[in-house]
């Protein structure tokens, strides 16, 4: 598997939009699913210049932290297979429920090992940000996500209840 994390750009416009359309269709037909990083849906991709410009929070805003958004690109297949958002800091909400990294694999590419590798690459980015520990969370019923986190060194700290859903909180030492 040869994947890399890339920033959103016009070079990958078609692959990004193709992935977003698949995710939107999936989420409309599976309303119970929360399977994508919210950052990639902050803005409508139809105005792609605006979409790219507002993909990340570069300056702190009330209730939000600076972040970096990456897309996971499989160059052999010329396919965007996932996306992730790395929060540079944790506010109270992220410390309890969201963590440093929000990630997701496009529906047609799940259960192929991409998430484990994508998290490994994200942890390299976290090191570059100067983080020494990273918090990742997932719904307790998302076994695949938990396995990907554990494979990258995640140690379960505890479980917390968020709006009727049990979240597992894992710490990874870098």
Identify what each model region corresponds to.
Residues 126-137:
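Conserved GNAT acetyl-CoA-binding A-motif
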Residues 137-138, 150-169:
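Conserved catalytic-core motifs of GNAT/GCN5-like acyltransferases
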